[in-house]
């Protein structure tokens, strides 16, 4: 699937750049959108939707016969799907010139440090760095090692430790009192942050060792004073991508 998405969007990028007519450009862009979102919908959300709507239909006397698919969720499908779509959208908007080398685009799509857990990098930021093939500076190596160590600490020492306590309490919640359950919920929120933030720190640190700069993914979200600020500081790459490519396109500001 990664190879299919890479081939489709590399080809679409070349066609978009060469197209002069607006109608044809839209057709190529739609090909990219439907291909990527279609693959994502089938492999990540097919089971969820059919298992959710089948019982709902039976309540109203309906009967939905759906195909049972033993789908194995591909690693990182959400991240590279949005990443390749940013490439074709930016070319369509005139913000990016497509890369001429397929290998450069393939590395951009499958860049291993951030493929599994992000951050979701835009083509305008990551692709030019890959094309230049930079050598890491001494500062990048030092900062990269610090990020990797910090990420491992957050993931193993905080996230995993909190997870063991949370799993133990959630396994038999009826034997615990309200304060203990409340503490477990708070620990669960810490576990989620430590896991995601830890993975991201490791990804950013590994990229620095390769001379590549990735964007921040989290900015101390639990110190936010309101929901809006929390949204801006949690999963930054996804929230900013949705704002720029969806919200503003629909008329937001």
Predicted regions and their residues:
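Membrane-embedded transmembrane alpha-helical bundles that form the catalytic cores
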Residues: 1-253
